[in-house]
Amino acid sequence: MSIKASGGSPLARPQLYRTASILTITQAEQQDRFLQLGELNQLVSFLNSGQKRLEVADILTKNANILVARAADKIFVGGSAISYLERPQAAVIIAGDQSSRDKINELSGNIQGDFGQSFRSLFNAGGATPPGFKPINVLRYGTTRMRKSLRDLDWFLRYLTYAIVSGDPNILSVNIRGLRELIDNACSSAAAIVALREMRRTALAIFEEDIKGQDLVREYFNVVISEFEAPSLTDKLRKRESTDLQGLRLPQTYSQAGVSTPRFVMKSSLSADEKNTVVKACYRQIFERDIAKTYDLSLSNLESQVKNGQISIKEFIRSLGTSNIYRKQFYEPFVNSRALELAFRHFLGRGPSSLEEFQKYFAILSATGLSGLVNAILNSAEYADYFGEETVPYFRKLGEEPQECRNWGPQIDLLNYSAPFRKVPQFITLFSDYKQSLPDQHPYGTGNDPLSIQFGAIFPKENKDPRKRQAIFGKDTRRILVRRGPGIYNQISNPQVRPKSAGSLGPKIFKLSNTLVATNSSANFENSVDVIAKVSYLRVFGREVYQEEKLLLRPIESQLQDGQISVREFIRQLAKSSIFRSLYWEPLYICKAIEYIHNRLLGRPTYGRQEINKYFDIAYKEGYYQVVDAIIDSPEYIETFGENVVPYERYTTPAGIALRSLRPGIIDQRFKKVISSKSSRFVELGKVKEIRSSNDIQSRIAQGVTALRDQSVIFDVNQNSSQEVLEQALRAAYRQIFERDLNSFSIGGEFLDIESSFLNKQINVKELIQKLALSELYGKEFYQPYPNTKVIELGTKHILGRAPNNQAEIRFLNQILASKGLSTFVETLVNSSEYDSVYGTNTVPYRRFPTLPAANFPNTETLYNRLTKQNVSVVVPSFKKVLGNQ
């Protein structure tokens, strides 16, 4: 088996401990149900005690030094033990009021004790002294050991506060069980037990007046001491039946820390609700959902048999696996390899372990079909050992039992909820990679990137048609590159031929000199410098530059034309330009960007991880410009291109060469279909019968909209407008309101005050429009001669620049006009939100050519094109009676 191949390494985060809330919620989530009343009561009890738990943890934290000092004085003599407690790891004493200070002083006492005091305190503590305990002399014990011992005592107290806050002693059980054997090898576990008991006694004395706090501290200290005294747990072994399968062991702390997978066992003594829960667990395991709840499907006959004890859970699982529902969901949509992997997930709770096991069950599946595979799995010895006759299969995932390293990635993916959405088999692909030779591919990633156009794709997203493969290359693997030209000129075997041209077999080489050198080309160029610049753009940017971009690059190109810089320096400046950065640096992650830049400037992909890591380190520590300098100032660049040669492609990948060539195997052999001469009926009906002129076509394109829409002039004024602009706006207002230009001769003295106020900037345009519409002349011309409907039309035309929208608007304005008169009608239009949003306070109203609603455009068109004095008919009755316009 290849040592390079692996199943990938998805991130695994085993749960380190449990809390009361996590345990309750996770158990309900695993069973796909809501929280029950008892679980809700547990959460309520935990949340209600939260303030007390935080208070207890805070008091223990404030008195941490005292607790550790008292515990240390109990087991150490001949010196001040607390002085060896390292301050950064010790809890901080935060003294409160005077009473708390007195209590701390009372508890702390004199920590300088002698052997007699320590020995006498053993008999006053209460409880039997552990056998083998002897007080430890500080001087003989040594500084290093004293620091470690005090650190351990402080660690016990800290984890006690963690457990109190979390509401579950699980964090203590996971981390303390097994420490007794470890401490026995270093010093004395009996001394640790004495210290913990003394710490408990002192902590209980702190909460002497708080019964609830005292009970809480006693409960968790008892867990600390009992877990420390208990022997360490043995590892969970996973025995295998075949020599090709791995035997594994798992420390039980992993399974204790996480929330264990619930086991559902069918017993005749269970209640009806409990039996229903077991049946639902079978559905969730086999069909990955509760089909009775999700799809309203149930196998009532089988359910009644298993509940009545006529068939076992094993036979019930067998019936589910051979049912039409399972066949349509997990067998027919997949190839046999993937169907086999999903069957292992559903019936054994794991994935295939080896190629031999896969071949064995694949042969059964191919020969006997789905029913034969299900029977073979359920009749296996492994199924009998783990699940027996009455236990529902469950996922044997990380934390539940030890996992194999050779199928680590596919195993974790298989137990994910999204496993049925992956159609491509994973395990057989992985097992075949173990036995095959290494393919030619990029040293990064999962076999993804042999093409010369996809460098650095080390993290491909598998959103569509996922094909996860293992990363089989290490950091010392060198990539295979093909030389453009004779193979004897390869720089790996012969570095001295780097500057040697490949001749007619290689790419064109452009060199800046008095005459342009173009290998295998007889083209005549007008100016060699212009050609060098153009070729450099194509090489560096991968395309011709745009006109605006060329303006930015013109100073650099001028320096090249004047001979102030060489081609090498010209390439450097192009690579440092903002154009190049926006193409190959800013939108890409660093690894892929370095691949692109390296290929553009040096003419070849990177050889492997070591080379790209060098540039990655430079980019991280020194920045982008130093990466460009490192490539252009490298010995390989100088030896190959020198000062005046434009970089060219020297090496590429084998797949890149195959991509550029047309081979019979990659040419699409599909032929074009013969198009029938008979056209469809809808095409014939859609053909134009008459001959249309260009003017007719243009009018149809315009769809009735004239050029006036684009030629409209909008008059705006502001505080800085000149007198001439104000006069123009005033004349435009006259034409808009009265539909004609009024001069001083015709208006007489009626508008002199209005005109004077506007020209002196005492009123704005909006107020001007309102005063003009409220004038006697407007009432005489557009109100008195017409009915209300026509007045509404003219009012919206003059003030809002459009015809009425619908009958509902006409009805609303008619009520205002009929009940309150013209002045209120004008004020309603001028002060409307539509007027403010379209014209504001400084814009003269104008024709707006509205297109919504659709009927409003022809009405407005008719209203503006009709001569008002010659035609008094109403326009808006063209509205049809449609629901919403009424």
UniProtKB/Swiss-Prot annotation:
| InterPro entries xrefs | Globin-like_sf (IPR009050), PBS_linker_dom (IPR001297), PBS_linker_sf (IPR038255), Phycobilisome_asu/bsu (IPR012128), Phycobilisome_asu/bsu_sf (IPR038719)
Give the Enzyme Commission number.
4.-.-.-
Q: Where does (2R,3E)-phycocyanobilin bind?
A: C187
Question: Mind telling me how this protein is modified after translation?
Answer: Contains one covalently linked bilin chromophore. This protein autochromophorylates (Potential).
Q: Which GO terms describe its cellular component?
A: chloroplast thylakoid membrane; phycobilisome
Top-level taxon of the source organism: Eukaryota
- Going by the record, the broad EC class of this enzyme is lyase
Q: Which residues form the PBS-linker domain?
A: 244-424, 496-678, 695-876
Give UniProt keywords alphabetically.
Antenna complex, Bile pigment, Chloroplast, Chromophore, Electron transport, Lyase, Membrane, Photosynthesis, Phycobilisome, Plastid, Repeat, Thylakoid, Transport
What subcellular locations does the record give? Plastid, Chloroplast thylakoid membrane
Q: Name one GO biological process term.
A: photosynthesis
Topology relative to the lipid bilayer, per the entry, is:
Peripheral membrane protein
Q: What is its main location?
A: plastid
The disulfide bridges present are none
| UniProt key word Lyase | yes
Q: What does this protein do?
A: This protein is postulated to act both as terminal energy acceptor and as a linker polypeptide that stabilizes the phycobilisome architecture. May have intrinsic bilin lyase activity.
UniProt similarity note:
Belongs to the phycobilisome linker protein family.
Protein name as it appears in the record: Phycobiliprotein ApcE
